[in-house]
């Protein structure tokens, strides 16, 4: 981003913020939602009904979940260090409290470029709704987003970073780049779907082009999902 910056360094990336807020563009600022909203539904894995209340949050809060059904009303930060499970869904845990199947809601928040929000839940699992991010995006659009007078924190990597999970046959590579770009390739080893490829050069296209993508599974996977209490 253009404008004055302040940087810190690590072995893998620079951290910097845009200091010249007068000349900063909309994307340089943190955002929250304008007002509270409520979303209810059932979890796809637990089958339990859950109600979520999404609330505006102060700058630098980040994305936080709160289990209001628990006596401690534990807050769980949406942080990679809190990820404890990724089998068919993503689960976060903090101080013994869990929140699961967060990925579609998280995608909607990223697509809407929302930085700060508190999500209260009266159960463990985020509702699946129609199996995509689109219902979350539509509800967030109804209340709108609010620009906060606080700069975003940016991470700029200095060299290639590679992550490989041999068991799940996943490889991710982050490359230094002057702009935003995500390139994905997936092969389901199936004659029905085959190999699929997508290239996203601007997060602004998420709502129209990606949010409606839905969860699915193959028929031959059903037995394993049932045996592992995932459906």
Spans of features found by a protein language model:
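Short acidic-hydrophobic catalytic motif
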Residues: 11-231
């Amino acid at each position: 981003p253009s404008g004055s910056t302040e940087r810190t360094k690590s072995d893998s990336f620079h951290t910097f913020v845009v200091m010249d807020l007068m000349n900063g563009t909309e994307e340089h600022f943190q955002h929250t939602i304008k007002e509270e909203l409520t979303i209810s539904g059932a979890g796809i894995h637990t089958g339990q009904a859950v109600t979520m209340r999404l609330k505006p949050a102060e700058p630098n809060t980040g994305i936080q979940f709160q289990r209001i059904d628990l006596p401690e009303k534990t807050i769980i930060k949406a942080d990679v260090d809190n990820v404890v499970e990724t089998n068919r869904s993503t689960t976060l845990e903090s101080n013994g409290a869990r929140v699961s199947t967060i990925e579609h809601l998280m995608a909607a928040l990223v697509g809407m470029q929302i930085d700060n929000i508190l999500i209260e839940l009266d159960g463990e699992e985020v509702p699946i709704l129609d199996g995509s991010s689109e219902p979350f995006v539509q509800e967030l659009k109804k209340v709108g987003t609010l620009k906060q007078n606080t700069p975003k924190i940016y991470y700029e990597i200095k060299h290639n970073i590679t992550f490989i999970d041999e068991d799940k046959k996943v490889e991710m590579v982050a490359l230094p780049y002057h702009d935003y770009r995500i390139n994905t390739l997936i092969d389901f080893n199936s004659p029905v779907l085959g190999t699929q490829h997508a290239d996203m050069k601007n997060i602004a296209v998420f709502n129209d082009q990606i949010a409606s993508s839905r969860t699915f599974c193959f028929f031959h996977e059903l037995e394993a999902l049932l045996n592992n209490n995932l459906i």
